[in-house]
């Protein structure tokens, strides 16, 4: 039986970073179902698209990733959210984990690290669905 493709939404205010992440996920067991450039759009899209996983940048205009994380988890607690940041200071990491983040990916992206992080999360999703 084939594995269910995991739906992912990519959120980053930097077009190039979204393109890189989308490229890393291409050809894998993931389907990028949406992209957003800020937290405000991300919250709206998450509610509409209902992705399994959201890769969410921390530092963005309008609504930052931590604010968006809180709103997304309040509306859809089953959605796994991986925070993306270039500066994983302990306070940010702690706040994100307390608010339901499933993991962290540090910029610049490393394809192996991204895929390893997402695979661990996918296993949790599959166990929950089994």
Q: What spans do the regions from the language model cover?
A:
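Receiver (REC) domain active-site loop signature in two-component systems and cognate sites
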Residues: 60
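Acidic catalytic/metal-coordinating carboxylates
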Residues: 38-41, 64-67
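C-terminal output helix
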Residues: 91, 109-119
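Active-site beta3 strand of CheY-like receiver
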Residues: 49-55
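Short, conserved "switch-loop" micro-motifs in signal-transduction and mechanochemical regulators
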Residues: 87-88
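Two-component/phosphorelay signaling modules centered on CheY-like receiver
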Residues: 15-34
